[in-house]
Amino acid sequence: MTALNKKWLSGLVAGALMAVSVGTLAAEQKTLHIYNWSDYIAPDTVANFEKETGIKVVYDVFDSNEVLEGKLMAGSTGFDLVVPSASFLERQLTAGVFQPLDKSKLPEWKNLDPELLKLVAKHDPDNKFAMPYMWATTGIGYNVDKVKAVLGENAPVDSWDLILKPENLEKLKSCGVSFLDAPEEVFATVLNYLGKDPNSTKADDYTGPATDLLLKLRPNIRYFHSSQYINDLANGDICVAIGWAGDVWQASNRAKEAKNGVNVSFSIPKEGAMAFFDVFAMPADAKNKDEAYQFLNYLLRPDVVAHISDHVFYANANKAATPLVSAEVRENPGIYPPADVRAKLFTLKVQDPKIDRVRTRAWTKVKSGK
């Protein structure tokens, strides 16, 4: 064989080996698809997981249970893990969109708070399909200085009167008001405020007093959205919002970091408020199950989930993590409510589809103002 042929052959072999090597690496690249709420994980959680495991995470976000439910019910989600609220998970279970979790692959499950597991089990019997992640309340986020400037030093910031009493909201309109785009939660909040069952099974409660009040409030509501209010509160663009505790505290923290002089706080009203639990679940069509279990175990580590709580300002469901959560978060009664406040909290129950339809139509009417 000539030197030229030898050179040509060695180059061919080297090229073939390189191609095989690249192909092998591509074949070995593991991927995980996650669909979570916006602003609901620490900035470095996914990157740290990727670095530790070599798994590539494709991470997408949503800002309402309705958006997630639409994708789940349509089938072929393409996601390996999703994060519904427990009350939504309950009705999705009847549609068979999730697969049971194999607890033998979740050795760190023991770190979860038994009391929270019992509460979530009301929606997911025996905690068969879902792993609790974070929990919080739906309350009032407000700009302390602007609200006092409009309503005075004695503004009822500890009451739903602040935002559900028409004469108050009419005055607050000048500095900006937002409501969650979450019909189940807003209607439950209004019904509770009116002294009715927040989980009423009477269609007339939704189409009558609840809708009547919301229509009176509607002209003074700038927008309905479930994430925009975070930055708007932080920047001082709105002064009051029906929002989720962790999101409002994120707004407060962003304002402090920006040193913009905006003072944001959160209130769990004295009349009672809704508590919710968000959970990780695996869609029935999940393709990367092993990778999904690795991520769930990663989140079950106390140090990991405590770090997330410190960034998102939500209480986590991991009892072993509580001592590791910063005092700023752990000792904040708006994030970890004391017993007397917890006693006034309520949760959503799955409703008959007829009530769902009534509520959806009423919500469309409220948002349009007609």
Swiss-Prot record:
Pfam families documented for this protein: SBP_bac_8
On subunit structure and binding partners, the annotation says: The complex is composed of two ATP-binding proteins (PotG), two transmembrane proteins (PotH and PotI) and a solute-binding protein (PotF).
Classification via NCBIfam families: PRK10682.1 (NF007962)
Record flagged with keyword Transport:
yes
* TM ranges: none
Disulfide bond in keyword set: yes
**Keywords from the UniProt entry:** Disulfide bond, Periplasm, Signal, Transport
**Residues that bind putrescine:** S38, D247, D278
Q: Which InterPro entries match?
A: SBP (IPR006059), Sperm_putr-bd (IPR001188)
Q: What does this protein do?
A: Part of the ABC transporter complex PotFGHI involved in putrescine uptake. Binds putrescine. Imports putrescine for maintenance of the optimal concentration of polyamines necessary for cell growth in the presence of glucose.
Query: Gene of origin?
Result: potF
One GO BP on record is: putrescine transport
Question: What family is reported?
Answer: Belongs to the bacterial solute-binding protein PotD/PotF family.
Q: Its domain of life?
A: Bacteria
User: What Gene Ontology terms describe what this protein does at the molecular function level?
Assistant: putrescine binding
Q: Which GO terms describe its cellular component?
A: ATP-binding cassette (ABC) transporter complex, substrate-binding subunit-containing; membrane; outer membrane-bounded periplasmic space
Q: What regulation of activity is recorded for this protein?
A: Transport is feedback inhibited by intracellular polyamines.
PANTHER family in UniProt? BIFUNCTIONAL POLYHYDROXYBUTYRATE SYNTHASE _ ABC TRANSPORTER PERIPLASMIC BINDING PROTEIN-RELATED, SPERMIDINE/PUTRESCINE-BINDING PERIPLASMIC PROTEIN
Instruction: Extract the CDD domains matched here.
Output: PBP2_PotF
Q: Where in the cell is it found?
A: Periplasm
The record's disulfide annotation reads C175-C239
Signal peptide limits = 1-26
Put simply, this protein is called Putrescine-binding periplasmic protein PotF
